[in-house]
Amino acid sequence: IMNNIYEDIAKRTQGDIYIGVVGPVRTGKSTFIRRFMETLVLPNIENDFKRERTKDEIPQSGSGRTIMTVEPKFVPADGVEIKIKDTVSLKVRMVDCVGYIVDGALGHEEDGKQRLVSTPWSKEAMTFEKAAEIGTKKVIKDHSTIGIVIITDGSVTGIERSSYIIPEERVIKELKSLKKPFAVVLNTKHPNSEDTKFLRKDLEEKYDVPIIPMDVDKMDEEDIEEVMETVLYDFPLGEIGRASCRERV
């Protein structure tokens, strides 16, 4: 079954799986990219040199409240060919986004003012908040064939769930308006708890999209498959090849 999922996605994206990973800060976006690369991408890169180089480009991820990603990062820089189960060839690249700011997160301010960050989309440095906003739109619209939104119940960072709600609403609304296929991952230390089941149900009703709860730090091949299958179902039926990707910053 796994091959079929990747084969179907490859047909719909001309073989380019460019994944924009977006969401509020401190939800686990860099961790998702690291696990995805370690689990699905690195083992399927045939060229040793490219495998090592790709490994070096995987973003740092950390626990706690401090923001790790302060500028958008393409991982790997030019996309890399992988072959799944020796049958499906794909070109994969992920984009780690600057997230929308969450109350309680640290690292986006200096001397009480918002930090200025540099981005590929502007010669001028811009505030963290603006970088998150422009970056999310740009990454999904121009540099992704599919989107993954990472949200959390707060158990992975110790930041209150309530602090995440407004930025989470913004990012999901943004993705819906951009009309790219996407999936929503709920990052939690307790994916199978009753509380998580209730939260999932609430969020699915609120956003009208499937929510996949998992502990992203422990994400395995089966979890990735579930995410990709959810994305696949979000492609419009019969619109094979529509999700083309403009390669310009």
Language-model segments: residues:
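Conserved G1/Walker A P-loop phosphate-binding module
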Residues: 1-123, 141
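Hydrophobic/aromatic beta-strand patches that form the interior of the parallel beta-sheet core
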Residues: 19, 93-95, 145-149, 183-185, ...
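Conserved NTP-handling cores and scaffolds of large molecular machines
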Residues: 40, 44-52, 101-105, 140, ...
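Conserved nucleotide-binding/hydrolysis micro-motifs of P-loop NTPases
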Residues: 98-102, 153-156, 189-192, 217-220
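Conserved ATPase-coupling elements of RecA-like P-loop NTPase cores
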Residues: 104-107, 158-163, 193-197
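Inter-motif core of Ras-like GTPase G domains
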Residues: 105-158, 174
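Charged helix-capping and loop-helix junction motifs
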Residues: 163-169
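Canonical P-loop GTPase G-domain recognition
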Residues: 170-183, 188-246
